[in-house]
From Swiss-Prot:
It catalyses: L-citrulline + L-aspartate + ATP = 2-(N(omega)-L-arginino)succinate + AMP + diphosphate + H(+). It is an enzyme of class 6 (ligase). This is Argininosuccinate synthase. Pathway: Amino-acid biosynthesis; L-arginine biosynthesis; L-arginine from L-ornithine and carbamoyl phosphate: step 2/3. It is found in: Cytoplasm. It comes from Neisseria meningitidis serogroup C (strain 053442). The keyword Protein transport does not apply. L-citrulline binds at residues 102, 138, 142, 195, 204, 206, 283. Disulfide bonds: none annotated. SUPFAM superfamilies: Adenine nucleotide alpha hydrolases-like, Argininosuccinate synthetase, C-terminal domain. Transmembrane segments: none annotated. ATP binds at residues 20-28, 46, 132, 134, 139, 197. Signal peptide: none annotated.
Amino acid sequence: MSQNHTILQSLPVGQKVGIAFSGGLDTSAALLWMKLKGALPYAYTANLGQPDEDDYNAIPKKAMEYGAENARLIDCRAQLAHEGIAAIQCGAFHVSTGGIAYFNTTPLGRAVTGTMLVSAMKEDDVNIWGDGSTYKGNDIERFYRYGLLTNPALKIYKPWLDQQFIDELGGRHEMSEFLIANGFNYKMSVEKAYSTDSNMLGATHEAKDLEFLNSGIKIVKPIMGVAFWDENVEVSPEEVSVRFEEGVPVALNGKEYADPVELFLEANRIGGRHGLGMSDQIENRIIEAKSRGIYEAPGMALFHIAYERLVTGIHNEDTIEQYRINGLRLGRLLYQGRWFDSQALMLRETAQRWVAKAITGEVTLELRRGNDYSILNTESPNLTYQPERLSMEKVEDAAFTPLDRIGQLTMRNLDITDTRAKLGIYSQSGLLSLGEGSVLPQLGNKQ
């Protein structure tokens, strides 16, 4: 196997090493370990509007205490909101179960983090980057791609790929003891039955007990909304209106938001009151192994429902079909860490220019528990939905007459005749047979 010189398998002593620092046990221990082993760690923390983070400003201070040469907090929220809206406009969601989608909130967060943190590192002349992703997951590849796209001279050093680090600090207990031994009164948080990763767009709960499919959504404590499955949690029906202008969500309940970050936060609050957007998915990781996750995305779900309602009321069938096909493909590219690749940009351009630009209007919904909702009203100056065209009542100046329909049906005789001929061929060859007691063609028993 050829050696990848971009990935450093041992600590680059004496060199600047940027680390994506969360302030948790793993990155705290890694930063201190790198410092004591002779590297020059620089800490970078992304403010992604994580709903489970109370004090972002405290994180860089903590990094300095653990030995960082410098620590910076990078505000990524505006860019994350921008990419979230782009995903809504393109329907870039390929994982779904029973019609309920996973809104690719973690891949969107990685696209923003991977580019903005590495860009900040370039400003500090830091060309080696490490983060906490493991070799079995998706993030190691996503960060690898986005990092090198942003800085082609980038080298990758991950403590979790360094055998010396693994031997010395291979587990949470060892990392905690290491911090205590070096004078830091670190108290391990109580471990949950699963791990959580979040940003402003959504939360991901996975691993540990959730790896077992007989552990359901009920073991999860939502961080962006309510446990709607709990009968003791009071959830009242609520009407909400969402307004779009040229594909961009701009108002909730009649209130306009100039700041997309505030818009998402309010959408999260509204949807979260009902548990909207929670889903349980089995998905294929980039390496084709299957994983399972419980997801939250109340704001994304609210915007997606309203946007697609307008899409179906404004665009024709072929456009909608292409939007859905392209969205599935784009969602997979996003999941794989290819959000800025040329094929993804091509699909994004198609949807944002030719689909989203026409999406102006307002949708009113009633939200109940979980993903239970009703659409109460749809308004748009661009609607091609015109009920008089198909009215069962007698109307003046009808769009077409009975004679027109007779002519249209007569033209169908051409393909009906062709289809009947093909069915005869299939029947003669044994591919189709008439089932017992049935006049409908059925697949034959021949192998």
